[in-house]
Amino acid sequence: MIKQNKMKKYILPALKLTLVLVILCSVLYPLLIAVVGRLTPGQGKGETVLVNGKVVGYTLIGQKFSDDKYFWSRPSAAGYNAAGSSGSNKGPSNPDYLKDVQAHIDTFLAHNPGVRKDEIPAELVTYSGSGLDPDLSPAGAKIQVKRIAVVRKLSADKLYILVDNYTEKPLLGIFGPAKVNVLKLNLALDNLQ
């Protein structure tokens, strides 16, 4: 009898705590996140980019731009597939990874005459952790300006100003790097014509 009382003393509180945590973690927390998501711009579905009332992309999901008249995005190991978002999972000493990086370097140099290998920002030739980065550094965008200026027959100075205008500063001036959203930049580029 004494053993049963001791078991009740320990098991009942453990079961109660388990039930409380299941309700908290499986019901209340997801509901709270869903409500907060609905209060954000885009209502938790992501910030859509519209052109003439049509969705052309999302600000937080990178897209492939490979035409010389556009700023190129960062390479994607996931093929820009949002459902299969992932990095390459290959380390910097992996021979396959090194081949991929070299292929990206060769492609970039072939399309950007006058640029030296050591001038290319790493983000333009390496995969990101998510495979869907929508942003580049200002340097990653500016190194592409000459190619785009030639193809579109625009002034390079005009394009440098465009990049500067679309550069988002770090949050509160200290959190994170300056960045340029490639989709927004390319849409603004189309409006220059």
Regions found by a protein language model. Give the residues of each.
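N-terminal amphipathic/basic-hydrophobic helices that include classical n-h-c signal peptides
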Residues: 1-2
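Flexible, solvent-exposed loop/hinge segments and secondary-structure transition points
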Residues: 5-6, 13, 26, 31-151, ...
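Extracytoplasmic/periplasmic C-terminal soluble domains
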Residues: 147-193
